[in-house]
Amino acid sequence: MGSMFRSEEVALVQLFLPTAAAYTCVSRLGELGLVEFRDLNASVSAFQRRFVVDVRRCEELEKTFTFLQEEVRRAGLVLPPPKGRLPAPPPRDLLRIQEETERLAQELRDVRGNQQALRAQLHQLQLHAAVLRQGHEPQLAAAHTDGASERTPLLQAPGGPHQDLRVNFVAGAVEPHKAPALERLLWRACRGFLIASFRELEQPLEHPVTGEPATWMTFLISYWGEQIGQKIRKITDCFHCHVFPFLQQEEARLGALQQLQQQSQELQEVLGETERFLSQVLGRVLQLLPPGQVQVHKMKAVYLALNQCSVSTTHKCLIAEAWCSVRDLPALQEALRDSSMEEGVSAVAHRIPCRDMPPTLIRTNRFTASFQGIVDAYGVGRYQEVNPAPYTIITFPFLFAVMFGDVGHGLLMFLFALAMVLAENRPAVKAAQNEIWQTFFRGRYLLLLMGLFSIYTGFIYNECFSRATSIFPSGWSVAAMANQSGWSDAFLAQHTMLTLDPNVTGVFLGPYPFGIDPIWSLAANHLSFLNSFKMKMSVILGVVHMAFGVVLGVFNHVHFGQRHRLLLETLPELTFLLGLFGYLVFLVIYKWLCVWAARAASAPSILIHFINMFLFSHSPSNRLLYPRQEVVQATLVVLALAMVPILLLGTPLHLLHRHRRRLRRRPADRQEENKAGLLDLPDASVNGWSSDEEKAGGLDDEEEAELVPSEVLMHQAIHTIEFCLGCVSNTASYLRLWALSLAHAQLSEVLWAMVMRIGLGLGREVGVAAVVLVPIFAAFAVMTVAILLVMEGLSAFLHALRLHWVEFQNKFYSGTGYKLSPFTFAATDD
């Protein structure tokens, strides 16, 4: 089979890399992405490995790159993508990259520091000028000359009125949210021996750190006494106020203001030069950072891979072990040969035997990746196990569409996915960072098929936004029924519900060419008809899907050489499943084919027949579908029950018998091996895990000696119980196809009846259809997308996911493997 139907053959290779060419060879392998290295130094600490110094140097460079990246983002610039694919640089270039990076980082730190210092000085000058410009007039309190006011202190200052009557001033600026608290604290701490004036700046000033505009409150405080002045200075320091000297004379203030404006202009010129130099430094950073990040990341990845290698006894080469696809072995040999020849040495790679299970490698493209992701989300398949993904490409969208069948809804989903497919090569679409969008974009081909299959099942259900469409003429004739029955006006007035009898000549003209006849949308028993149809269809699809899963297990047994499981597991499982539930499908189809409208009144009940089948009984009122039906049903039940002990005991007894036979044969085999020379032995398998003995599920000597019959029997008992009970529960689980399909149809009907039908009625009555239908259609469109497409679509998706993971894959798929994760630079280049 191809690699999509089964994972590729993977071999364990041993690489001998000369020390001089080890870096070049591993770098080349990273560009190709062919091998997954095994850690041969698992017991060695990360700090004791050979290339730990180089890894630390790369990590220090990454920290510097992070600092430069933050500075670029702080400046509002965008890093350009690196041009082309950059190889991992030679080790000697690491020192050059480090020197250039450190020099740029230091220049940025110096320029940023100077810029912040200049901005802080400019901010101080602007605040000082704003304080002088605010026009605070020195208010000499009349507390000592005039009458008392409400702020006149009740007690005199310590020392009496003759202590110090000179008035001093403190001017400054404070943040607005601190001004009320500052004013209250000053008044209480100084006991009222001050006069404070607060005013808000008319224009905000740029904050020196954040660069955002900030408002400030200027203040002027008049006080008496040195002790009060000390208190005021301490309080303003606690509130981080900007305090400036205040000049009482108007001429002196104007002169100081002119001097401050001149200093501000000079500082702005210096700051402009600093910012221009900063732009030049950032331009050099934009040139160095994108390629430098890619190169250092690749270099670090190479050294981490080299740390997984062991050193030869002569210390002249590194020894590595890696998993590689057999298909890629020639490319691996060529890459090692070309890389090592550049250094004048030769690297060697050869396959070695291994008892460990190899990793799973399944190559995908942009179409199959989303379907393979659905399978891998449940569990990565074992090595060379049958891959469910090729079949999931068809079955998953189809089962989704069975629950989501509607032509209109499927068409909207198809167009949305088609738009993503057509725009998949646009850089803006790929670079979108929205996580929800990325989820939809990665599954665009899955959505495309889901929409396409929903259109198909929508035509079968004959539903388009819950409305039936008449593509072909109906197979029922109302006129023929009216002519034959003689319906009069009085009869029609008395009977609101009329019955079309298919036994009347000319009433039923034949089946509808495709899908359900649109006349069923007018019938009172429309829901009952759809219930019966979808329920039986769900059971049929479920049994076929599960039987297909059991059949796929045959390919696993044949490939791994476990042919005894064909008779002891697969055959009993198919007999049990088809003997019971396959027979139920047969009854449904047989009744469809053999029970016509003329015999509909006496049609037997399949449900009663199926129940009587297990009870070994018969209902006289429920006639048989075919002769000797009871004998056939009893035989099938007995045959299905007989498969249970075979399924339970067959495989354990076979393994135990084979185990004992090998134990008896082992001494003779060892004597023959001792007599035979080493060169006389047959060729061993290169990959020990994939040898014939391993494929047959055989065990090595240690495992054979430890084989416990109770564990084997317990494992098989769990498998038997799970399968037998699962046949019942899984068949019932497929009824969710019927339930969700019915729910989707009814929800669509309710949305149409409660929104669009009301809107159409209002438009006809009021005569303003164009005005009324615009908001109503907008509401209908929004609710259709939000409820029927997103919510109902997600629900159907999750149920289809469960049907594949539990009901289908557990019949043949273990999912206990692990992916081949090749050493590659692809993510770094992207």
From Swiss-Prot:
Residues 139-158, 681-701 are annotated as: Disordered. The keyword Nucleotide-binding does not apply. Its main location: membrane. It is a multi-pass membrane protein. Keywords: Disease variant, Hydrogen ion transport, Ion transport, Membrane, Osteopetrosis, Transmembrane, Transmembrane helix, Transport. InterPro entries: V-ATPase_116kDa_su, V-type_ATPase_116kDa_su_euka. One of its GO terms (cellular component) is late endosome. It is found in: Membrane. Residues 1-385, 424-438, 553-570, 656-720, 808-830 are cytoplasmic. One of its GO terms (biological process) is regulation of proton transport. Isoform long is highly expressed in osteoclastomas. Isoform short is highly expressed in thymus. Residues 405-406, 469-532, 592-635, 746-766 are vacuolar. One of its GO terms (molecular function) is proton-transporting ATPase activity, rotational mechanism. Subunit of the V0 complex of vacuolar(H+)-ATPase (V-ATPase), a multisubunit enzyme composed of a peripheral complex (V1) that hydrolyzes ATP and a membrane integral complex (V0) that translocates protons. V-ATPase is responsible for acidifying and maintaining the pH of intracellular compartments and in some cell types, is targeted to the plasma membrane, where it is responsible for acidifying the extracellular environment. Seems to be directly involved in T-cell activation. V-ATPase is a heteromultimeric enzyme made up of two complexes: the ATP-hydrolytic V1 complex and the proton translocation V0 complex. The V1 complex consists of three catalytic AB heterodimers that form a heterohexamer, three peripheral stalks each consisting of EG heterodimers, one central rotor including subunits D and F, and the regulatory subunits C and H. The proton translocation complex V0 consists of the proton transport subunit a, a ring of proteolipid subunits c9c'', rotary subunit d, subunits e and f, and the accessory subunits ATP6AP1/Ac45 and ATP6AP2/PRR. Belongs to the V-ATPase 116 kDa subunit family. It is linked to Osteopetrosis, autosomal recessive 1: A rare genetic disease characterized by abnormally dense bone, due to defective resorption of immature bone. Osteopetrosis occurs in two forms: a severe autosomal recessive form occurring in utero, infancy, or childhood, and a benign autosomal dominant form occurring in adolescence or adulthood. Recessive osteopetrosis commonly manifests in early infancy with macrocephaly, feeding difficulties, evolving blindness and deafness, bone marrow failure, severe anemia, and hepatosplenomegaly. This is V-type proton ATPase 116 kDa subunit a 3. The lineage of its organism: Eukaryota, Metazoa, Chordata, Craniata, Vertebrata.
